[in-house]
Amino acid sequence: MTWICLSCMLWPEDLEAPKTHRFKVKTFKKVKPCGICRQVITQEGCTCKVCSFSCHRKCQAKVAAPCVPPSNHELVPITTENAPKNVVDKGEGASRGGNTRKSLEDNGSTRVTPSVQPHLQPIRNMSVSRTMEDSCELDLVYVTERIIAVSFPSTANEENFRSNLREVAQMLKSKHGGNYLLFNLSERRPDITKLHAKVLEFGWPDLHTPALEKICSICKAMDTWLNADPHNVVVLHNKGNRGRIGVVIAAYMHYSNISASADQALDRFAMKRFYEDKIVPIGQPSQRRYVHYFSGLLSGSIKMNNKPLFLHHVIMHGIPNFESKGGCRPFLRIYQAMQPVYTSGIYNIPGDSQTSVCITIEPGLLLKGDILLKCYHKKFRSPARDVIFRVQFHTCAIHDLGVVFGKEDLDDAFKDDRFPEYGKVEFVFSYGPEKIQGMEHLENGPSVSVDYNTSDPLIRWDSYDNFSGHRDDGMEEVVGHTQGPLDGSLYAKVKKKDSLHGSTGAVNATRPTLSATPNHVEHTLSVSSDSGNSTASTKTDKTDEPVPGASSATAALSPQEKRELDRLLSGFGLEREKQGAMYHTQHLRSRPAGGSAVPSSGRHVVPAQVHVNGGALASERETDILDDELPNQDGHSAGSMGTLSSLDGVTNTSEGGYPEALSPLTNGLDKSYPMEPMVNGGGYPYESASRAGPAHAGHTAPMRPSYSAQEGLAGYQREGPHPAWPQPVTTSHYAHDPSGMFRSQSFSEAEPQLPPAPVRGGSSREAVQRGLNSWQQQQQQQQQPRPPPRQQERAHLESLVASRPSPQPLAETPIPSLPEFPRAASQQEIEQSIETLNMLMLDLEPASAAAPLHKSQSVPGAWPGASPLSSQPLSGSSRQSHPLTQSRSGYIPSGHSLGTPEPAPRASLESVPPGRSYSPYDYQPCLAGPNQDFHSKSPASSSLPAFLPTTHSPPGPQQPPASLPGLTAQPLLSPKEATSDPSRTPEEEPLNLEGLVAHRVAGVQAREKQPAEPPAPLRRRAASDGQYENQSPEATSPRSPGVRSPVQCVSPELALTIALNPGGRPKEPHLHSYKEAFEEMEGTSPSSPPPSGVRSPPGLAKTPLSALGLKPHNPADILLHPTGEPRSYVESVARTAVAGPRAQDSEPKSFSAPATQAYGHEIPLRNGTLGGSFVSPSPLSTSSPILSADSTSVGSFPSGESSDQGPRTPTQPLLESGFRSGSLGQPSPSAQRNYQSSSPLPTVGSSYSSPDYSLQHFSSSPESQARAQFSVAGVHTVPGSPQARHRTVGTNTPPSPGFGWRAINPSMAAPSSPSLSHHQMMGPPGTGFHGSTVSSPQSSAATTPGSPSLCRHPAGVYQVSGLHNKVATTPGSPSLGRHPGAHQGNLASGLHSNAIASPGSPSLGRHLGGSGSVVPGSPCLDRHVAYGGYSTPEDRRPTLSRQSSASGYQAPSTPSFPVSPAYYPGLSSPATSPSPDSAAFRQGSPTPALPEKRRMSVGDRAGSLPNYATINGKVSSPVASGMSSPSGGSTVSFSHTLPDFSKYSMPDNSPETRAKVKFVQDTSKYWYKPEISREQAIALLKDQEPGAFIIRDSHSFRGAYGLAMKVSSPPPTIMQQNKKGDMTHELVRHFLIETGPRGVKLKGCPNEPNFGSLSALVYQHSIIPLALPCKLVIPNRDPTDESKDSSGPANSTADLLKQGAACNVLFVNSVDMESLTGPQAISKATSETLAADPTPAATIVHFKVSAQGITLTDNQRKLFFRRHYPLNTVTFCDLDPQERKWMKTEGGAPAKLFGFVARKQGSTTDNACHLFAELDPNQPASAIVNFVSKVMLNAGQKR
């Protein structure tokens, strides 16, 4: 053991007399100078045997210098620090001399043990410090009198280490007694916890830096302990590189400097000296960077950046030479909170052809929090990879959009000679996921090739998985085999002693070759579609990982070994690859007592897969993927429909199943094995070998049930093992405590776990996966103790402070626990940790450190079985967790989404047995392929059939509620961020660009604004449909000559393919990004991504990327050439969007050449008629889940050809099916088809009306009252032009009841009119139906007051000559004007476009320039821009779930608060809330447009067919399925387009199939209800027969659909949970239907095929249920009619109270009240808020009150996503007693303040007061308060 004096920094030996030299005479063959006289020694001389000092023999007597031995590090390979030492990234350091440091004896040096001490000089240089690092077994240093650092090299001998640990423990006990607290910074070792009474686990991977929050937690804990007693000391224990100790010492030095005192100055100096002398030379750049972050945040020199950053490019300047001929093959792995979120393709860079390489991430990858970016080099021929560089940073400290790291800033690379000295790495960020303009120069040269085969196991191999579950088995016996597939192999390895070195080798060391790996790509969702994890490859994972050096042959196993492996693998569902699924489950359930269970940290690589084929009971195979309107729902993205799951830090399950962490060697494991555990896909979950506890001789080691990353993301904590197992193990959570105080600690396993708060997921896949894992958790935790949460650890610490004995685990035996290492942080936690970090920096006062970390703590030990530790806060918000509502069978209660567990009343928490995981859902895992079984580890179910996962919830002590930190995570919002006017471009942070980005900005900004033009169209996210609002009313401005049209196109061939094989997959070879196709217009500013494409949080994407001057980088290279033949139908359609604006100013052209304007090429005639059958491509209305490629507004008119071309369909379906698009006022351009002038106007039937709309929702300008309301759009003949059919809005007909809610203003266009939404081209100029041309066409735009002109031309009068298109929008038209100037720009020049915008049209402002101003009360500020101060009806309408958009319908799920005396302007009746049985519900809206109702006339097909590249029957056109391009994320362009094959000619399809599918389509008006909410669907179905169903647009997962269906019996879990209330609601189950490149399918069902359309899906499931609980029963009548027949009058007070009401308000602040409530609490909170400096920034939130409680939704995601306060926690609600007002930052009248007081989550005494200010004058604070009081009163009466 080495001791060092800190006062002089000298070793004890250095204080002794100088040592004399031991000279010997030597003949020098090489010239060497004499050390004394400096003359050359020519022949003989003397040299010292010890220090090699040389001199002449005559000079020997003059030698005075002491003999100093050389530093040992000189003999150690310089590469030893390069790679993580704990056997991570095996093969990464192979070319550097090996990954693990070799023992010093191997290099010929002498190992220095405590008994052999070298004489070292003072530590002043790197060599000496390296000597310290490498030479001694154990280094114990008193950094200060009260801080002791104990460090041990990772390569040291284990026996010596154990003995040294014992010596240290004895020394500490003898010297400090019980007054020392040990902080373990490395892997947990059982012997450490045995030897020391007080241990806190804060481990993180070696050579890495800890999370910023963890640094805060450590400092706070140290300070608390040291301040508790002057005799207390802190011991920092570390095994590995001493950089970990350095980070803590430096951080604490800065931390203690906050409250600097003179008596601590010496301590701080000692810490500084220790850090600089001993740590800096051996530390990593990232560690120094984090110390700098911490110091800067504490001092205020670094301001918190709360904005999320989207990473678009990683540019490596200078090509490292990792290949023999130069060059390298890099690929990136990006981790957020140590969770993999992205894997790039492999770039092959020749050594001499490039000076830099750009790795482009499309769409931009959302990064927030602690980020680790690791760049690997994939070796060319060997299955190995090296680390090129590694860099860690935290986004809170990144303020520039261009960040450059030099070589000296890059871990690993900073001392790697292969990385050029001038090399640097540049990161290009933006504030949105869209491609950045102006970055064309970053495109790599032709010599750079990219391999997107990221399913290569070597690429998927994650380096950090094992760290979270690994322990360094200090004193335990070496397990006789690896505990599971440690390195990604399919089989575990039975370890045997190596005869040479005594190390443990492995039998069956090799894994199956790659070719032998079963390809489960069919069952894995594309990584790119969900989280941008990989690039184009949909093959996400494979099973095997080649071991470097392993032979290719698979060694045979003895029968005993096979049995052992089978037993081991039974927990994984692997069973050596050939056994069936039944065997897996039975294996698991009949597992012997000591057998292995599914490891909890193993992963389900089948992403979001829940279902199995065959034998399960129908009622137990339900997906139940709840998709919307849940209070705690996914924050930013949803589903794999092109979402950026990375927004939530979600890890694709195929990406990494658990927090990546460095995995140290299991004791005795052969050091040559790669220990980067493979996270392999292919449907096999893997468990890291070193994860299990000790095993006894007779059985395999205990392994915890399988676990996936999503579970960690969902905030679940990992479970301990079964109590019957030999040794319970604990794990840790990387970021569970949002406050960041104790985000990575470990606890005794058995202490009761409190229910984690619901966490926002990243995607629907994550949602499913969370449920998948929760199934196991429920099983595990019914039988396993849980690790206590952080807060308990905090209390543990305080109990130590109080000198209480450390609480023993509640398990029956002592628990040497596994290290609790970083669990993946959920995105919510990451966000909250950043926000909390900000607050922490303001709140970290060491003087008060002894106080509890959190203001709100529950009384420890208050519940049965509770440990003395207080509860851990689960969330920074005051949300309540939801009760366990899902069983293993995969059921999820209606109303709850996997992605977004709905908070439940606190009382429900108490029913959770403490041994169970508190997961929002218990879910059935699907393992390994399509025939997956559910692995239930419930002992009681062992005798059950394999497919009957039953739940047995053992009774147990009630779970204590979780304590909530008093910190309300509130990002510091500037007033401008809180402004309620989204039409204003938010001010962006200064663009501090560096590197390649900087020089692009000025030019682009200058280019974007030209003198006589409106401001550049700054794109803003329109949350309603994923668009970006263009704030320029001019589409024809020079900078945007063409406007992209997000029209989705489906080739007829493709449609036929899909129709012929409804359950199959379209053979679509190239699914390129259509969004890019439309963005790549020359000179076009990307005006709007296609609807429901990019799912970026609305509040995040407001930075105009055009301001960066960055041009999209389109991998598909789909440039739409403005001239020449279009290369594809997509391109031609895209040109159509451009043709309008360009033609606007051009002279009218005859219809004889329509294609020149519409498609850019001649459209061949079919059936002889050109004009009549021509339709310009028009998207569907956004209300429809599909975009129409043929402009028929999804069949706004009958799809049949006109009378002169073929039989016509009846006109009635026009309303029932044709009007599904909601094209009420006008059909699509194709409506100009040859409909005879005598064609009767379709009558408005009660086919379907949105329940979400009622008259109250829509108001318009006062003058609209006086005008006649239009009822339907008609096609008629205009006098004077008998041959031209005209479509006008009937302005003189009285409003039909069905349209009353929309028909407010005759000058409003049809609601959600698809044709208006993207293309206003009603046809080329002069589009006579028989070829007649219209001369002198004019374009006139009549605008109502408050509505900006839709056209460039002055507003004119209606003209009745030539061809007229009276384009009008109604308030419900969210899609009008989806492009800048779309209203006028896309109208062909030859049309009279009487474009009229109603003042209240929510979407007119969407892209019509900056003239729009958002009206207060707009539920989604990003979504609507109202004009002229008129608030849109949607603004008054209470709620829009976040997907109010994908459909374009802003489906309001709840009515506004009743304001009795006040009626809405312009309406004659009081506001009434719609309900399923109300008239508005039945008739209020036209029949929705079925997504696949895309009907093309022959002219359409004639025009489109030639544009498809049809090769061998494979259509290279887009698969119009609404899925994103392979790269996922924001490149999703046409989220809703599904092919309609009912009208396509199908040469080889069966007429029966076609007829039946058409039948399903024809009934779609009964079962496709896009606008209804979940509650309305339940109300419609709960009284129906089993099999009844409704498909609606998902309001949570944009672009997806929700399938609600009635089942015969509720899931078992629901029954067991004794849920109060009407169980009939539980009979309606909810599933998510996702859209993808290959069509639609049930989300998370491996045995579900892709269908080309919803109709095909419905038809197939009506024949065979597949993964559904039962077959679908296709309805023959509208359920809304039945609902009307069976129910009384709607909108009664009781209904309103039950359904709830909502509106938008300003969220002002949340203030802790301790136990105060009542008016005093509101008064106090108001006073504190108004007195605060700075005053809190108000944020617009959606305030919903229902019988369940109060739900707040921050639609802009500025502050939070959703917070739910169960009604039983709300104790008071009222106005401010002093009637103070809130002054709005944007001006306007002061608003009344009101608030409610609610108990904090997990607390029975502490309250928080949440303050709000009224926003909408039509929803006064008094009305809200009254309604809340009524709801509370009503709930009290029921109780």
Swiss-Prot record:
Q: Name one GO molecular function term.
A: zinc ion binding
Residue ranges of every copy of the PTB domain listed in the record: 1702-1837
Domain of life assignment: Eukaryota
Q: Which SMART domains match?
A: C1, PTB, PTEN_C2, PTPc_motif, SH2
Q: Which tissues is it found in, per the record?
A: In the lung, detected in the alveolar septa (at protein level). Ubiquitous.
The effect of residue 1197 to L is:
In a breast cancer sample; somatic mutation
> Where Phosphothreonine occurs along the chain?
504, 985, 1293, 1370
| Ranges of residues in domain Phosphatase tensin-type | 129-301
| PANTHER family attached to this UniProt entry | TENSIN, TENSIN-1
What name is this protein filed under? Tensin-1
Q: What species was this sequence derived from?
A: Homo sapiens (Human)
